Amino acid sequence: GIGMGLVRMVRPWNEWLIVWGYDINGPEPEVTEEFATGVARQLIGDPDLKIELLNANTWTVNNFYATRTSNGRVFCMGDAIHRHPPSNGLGSNTSIQDSFNLAWKLAMVLKGQAGEALLDSYNTERAPIAKQIVTRANQSIGETGPIFAALGMTEGVDPVQMQKNLEARSDGTAAAEAQREAIRKAIAFKKYEFDAHGVEMNQRYRSDAIVTDGQIEPAFELDSDLHYQPTTWPGARLPHAWVYDRETGAETSTLDLCGHGSFTLLTGLGGEAWVAAAEAVAADLGIRLVSHIIGPRRPFVDHHGDWARVREVKDSGCVLVQIGRASC
């Protein structure tokens, strides 16, 4: 782990979760009420604190991902294919994304709307994501160490010495100035854990279920871990933009125009031919498809031009969106 204890509220104000490290090279500790009380007192700083131990178990930081997520009729997801520390908050998100990716594909195959080869794309699309998020979460743990080093908290666990090291940063000496600079740099680097929007938002699928039609993948203009770069390039998640109901003025996200068990075609004025062609193909294949022509005097209007800025096609072009809300 990161070498630091944790106290987290479960229910205010009388139920708490405490995380405490132990040496994995030795035996697992027996977490008795006496042991747990000692840990709680040390973390909170109250030598007379009394607790009621509800439950205890041991857990080890994992650095594990599956390179293959399916085999025959067996499909795995969630913790079965990626296990990692809680850094970056990627656990539940990624598990839900796994199921979201697989569910609509299974439904189409079971309904006879797609061949079984569609299920191969689950492995092709999600296995690289498993590797990516496990790598990122474990890297974030390693990036915590410089903070403790800069604070002088890596030289033992004596509380008096630790407090002395912390107070040293308040001195007017050159050494204290260097310490303050080291602290600033170490904390700033944690943006890769707490502000890394691109880690998830920039994920792009590549599989036989994605048709690029020869389009060149857009390069990332900024750090792809930190900064989300909206794109409708096939395989990327559909960008959010507010569009407005012509009749009521209510705002609706482009994300909410899509999904709901249907493929979606988004186009603008002059894109009627795309609508006719897509609806004909959908009818022939027996699949659900919803079309939206976004523009003036249409059911949905792009008043602020937000959709026009991120769609990467002209008014007369189109974006075809999977049931899972990725461009395809």
Ranges and model annotations:
Residues 1-175, 203:
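Core Rossmann-like FAD-binding/catalytic domain of the broad FAD-dependent monooxygenase superfamily
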Residues 38, 42, 108-327:
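Helical substrate-recognition/capping region of FAD-dependent monooxygenase/halogenase enzymes
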